[in-house]
Amino acid sequence: MRKNSGSESLIVRSGSSGMRWVMISFAFVATVLNYLHRLSFTYLTANGYLRGIIPDDTFGYIASAFFIAYMISNAFSGFVIDKLGTRIGYSLSMAFWTTAGILHALALTPFQFGFFRFMLGIGEAGNWPSAIKLISEWFPSNERSTASGIFNSGASVGAVVAPPLIAWLGTTYGWQLTFVVIGVLGYLWLAIFWFTYYTPKKVIKEAKARIIPPLKLLKNRFVSGLTLSKIFMDPVWYFITFWIGRYLADVYGWNLAKIGWFAMLPFIVADFGNILGGLFTQWIIKKGVPIPKARKIAVGIFGLTMALPLLLGPFVINGPIGALIVLAIAGFGYTAYSANTMAFPADVVPKSATASVWGIASVGAGLGGVIFQSISGVAIKNLSTNFDYEIAYSAVFIGYGFMALIGLSILLFLTGPVVRDKELQEYVDQD
């Protein structure tokens, strides 16, 4: 333990102290681009030509195709990134999902969109293991929640930028060119990152340590519990980001231009969660609360902040502004919660396995996305047919609120203490 602590303190004391903020900015921008690609399809199909060929249930199935790929890719992307290193692994992920995003411009049928969404999911899954590994290389333990919040705020910023940008591009230049323009931005990031990023010398040796097999990692109680919790927790955020455009169109009759300006509001609020979630944990750590306990206190508070608005919101929403406020509070809770859960892997496993652990855990997120995106699409179509869209979405809101409580309970009560696994550390230290 002393050895690890001393190694981490070198990150702060060395000349790389300032450079680490440059490096985390790469992860932030990559996450923004990740969400621009992810949400472009969501808003372009909210109404207009693409809405005509992609109804609610088909949209749910196409979203599930993305998450099937996301789940499959997460099963191995973390191990590939741990093996290849952050620079090569992150670059390959960006190149793959950017190319898949551009190819959307060639799609003409729901099946073709589903195929390209599947390919997008394969590439996008690599963003989070890459960023988690980057943080473990550049930031000490007490700052990882804050660093995680900074890079993960890219998801909220991307979700903020996406509605007006995609609405403007889509209405001005058409949906095909929209996919192409976003892709060009990804290639620009790739070129700059490739010639800038490097791994600090002090962690190169550890980064080249033995790769821990996935089954060995899953035997760790915290890793398996984190994976299980993400099956229920992450799909709540996916619902907010994937369905907000259709929700505003279906329930309130908004067009793409209006959606573009108002759909970003919940994500502006959620963006504060990324930063404040990490800063809150850092603050109570400075007050003397042990790091593991501080993280669990934070996830408990912010997990409830996520669940309760969805459970109670349908009973108080009386218009689109009220709906946006409910989604904003829930989104804030999720991002603050995530800023802390992303810091857990480096507290439990060796740095050489952080990407692998997050990849494994994200398999759970992908599995939840596959299951609950399909269920959402079918439920909304059937309930809106038999009743109306307001009742349909209210039922789905409540369902996701209960899911958030389940995911939170698993993380708090089934994962055990957050302590470094000595057996795994000994495994990577073997010659």
PLM regions: where:
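Juxtamembrane intracellular "pre-TM" segments in multi-pass secondary transporters
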Residues: 7-16, 200-227, 251-254, 431
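Extracytoplasmic gate region of multi-pass secondary transporters
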Residues: 41-43, 221-277, 338-342, 372-373, ...
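Extracytoplasmic
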Residues: 22-56, 240-245
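Conserved MFS/SLC helix-loop-helix module at the cytosolic interface between two early adjacent transmembrane helices
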Residues: 72-111
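Cytoplasmic helix-loop-helix junction between adjacent transmembrane helices
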Residues: 116-155
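C-terminal ends and interior cores of transmembrane alpha-helices
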Residues: 95-108, 300-318
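Helix-loop-helix hairpin linking two adjacent transmembrane segments in secondary transporters
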Residues: 151-197
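Helix-breaking motifs and short loop linkers at transmembrane-helix boundaries and internal kinks
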Residues: 53, 85, 106-112, 140, ...
